[in-house]
């Protein structure tokens, strides 16, 4: 859990903003959303495999663009 210490003379709203930013960087909200509902192991594997395929397709598309530029 991210922690933010209030600096001397610092307004509370600035500290809250720093806290929100640190939570976002730590991925707290994304983790909470992911765990909001139970996901069966088969569904989790299926989701991860689909994400891997998508990443691979994106990588191939990026490489093909990189090789076709001849200028």
UniProtKB/Swiss-Prot annotation:
One cellular component term from this protein's GO annotations in UniProt: ribonucleoprotein complex
Question: Which HAMAP family does this chain map to?
Answer: Ribosomal_bS21
Q: Which organism is it from?
A: Acinetobacter baumannii (strain AB0057)
Q: Name one GO biological process term.
A: translation
Q: Which gene encodes it?
A: rpsU
Concerning its family, UniProt says:
Belongs to the bacterial ribosomal protein bS21 family.
Which GO molecular-function terms appear in the entry?
Answer: structural constituent of ribosome
UniProt cross-references to NCBIfam families, sorted A to Z: S21p
Q: Which UniProt keywords apply?
A: Ribonucleoprotein, Ribosomal protein
* Pfam families per the UniProt record, alphabetical: Ribosomal_S21
| InterPro entries noted in UniProt | Ribosomal_bS21, Ribosomal_bS21_CS, Ribosomal_bS21_sf
Keyword Cell cycle on this protein?
no
Q: What is this protein called?
A: Small ribosomal subunit protein bS21
